[in-house]
Amino acid sequence: IKDVATRLAAEGFAALAPDLYHGKVTKEPDEAGKLMMALDMTRASKELAKAAGYLAAQPYTAGRGIGATGFCMGGGLALTLACDSPQIKAVAPFYGVNPSPIDKVANIQGPVFAAYAEHDAWAGPAVREELARALTQHGKQHEIKVYPGTEHAFFNDTRREVYREAAAKDAWGKVLALFRENL
């Protein structure tokens, strides 16, 4: 996540990566899964809303709006943040689950680019289709892209077994274009 924040900063965006695990860090996928399952989602959502509020109050973001992106659980949290925080003007979740209830997407104030892996037990076709239906129903500008031949975490270049460079580069280009156009 630090790498993604650094990439965004290198592109000229103010970037903030809140520490939702309060100092607990791991590079092991199994341990990361355990941390994720133990995370208090209500508290995490509140912390993200505070972080977005902090960024929105900074002079270097004044009047521009805030973007949100995240991966896996963070993708779901980014979507939820966009539903709950009107200062979010663009959101780009990667293989995230949907907010609950799904009709919260009616509150989203900007366009959505959602990137998904073709083969993903976490955020599979039912998740993608539900999000597309809800965004369409509520008249929200969106693009939902499924990357053929990819698996969950295809953007993560530290996990060579699932990383797919072409898909990751395409998705990143779409995130940057979304943010440049809307923030």
Language model features with spans:
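Serine-hydrolase catalytic machinery in alpha/beta-hydrolase-like enzymes
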Residues: 1-60, 155-159
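C-terminal catalytic histidine-bearing segment of alpha/beta-hydrolase fold enzymes
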Residues: 136-183
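Generic structural signal for well-ordered alpha-helices
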Residues: 45-52, 128, 132, 176
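Short alpha-helix in the alpha/beta-hydrolase fold that links the catalytic acid
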Residues: 4, 124-134
